[in-house]
């Protein structure tokens, strides 16, 4: 079983910065905060140590999560039906977002779920 070699610290840092750019595109405040946090953690561990590969692996995994699992939403003004006070959000789903294939739904089979009669999900 072959394992992929870990990148060096600079490559991991660049990977993390690219992931923040993808995940937080259009949200300057969050993008700046995420990059500042990444820099802070890399600066704290500037010297090589025994746990350096662990920190690099953590940065690579964090970049992967940011790139594939973080979706941002923006509240859309004036949305919803008049008088109901519903809020609507527009999600920014980009090409890197991981999309599930609903295997859990397919394998659920004929399991019965108890639900309150007359209630919808938004009323709970």
From Swiss-Prot:
It is found in: Mitochondrion matrix. It comes from the Eukaryota. Disulfide bonds: none annotated. One of its GO terms (cellular component) is mitochondrial matrix. Keywords: Chaperone, Mitochondrion, Transit peptide. It holds the Pfam family Complex1_LYR. One of its GO terms (molecular function) is protein folding chaperone. CDD domains: Complex1_LYR_LYRM7 (cd20267). Its main location: mitochondrion. Interacts with RIP1. Assembly factor required for Rieske Fe-S protein RIP1 incorporation into the cytochrome b-c1 (CIII) complex. Functions as a chaperone, binding to this subunit within the mitochondrial matrix and stabilizing it prior to its translocation and insertion into the late CIII dimeric intermediate within the mitochondrial inner membrane. Modulates the mitochondrial matrix zinc pool. Belongs to the complex I LYR family. MZM1 subfamily. This is Mitochondrial zinc maintenance protein 1, mitochondrial. The gene is MZM1.
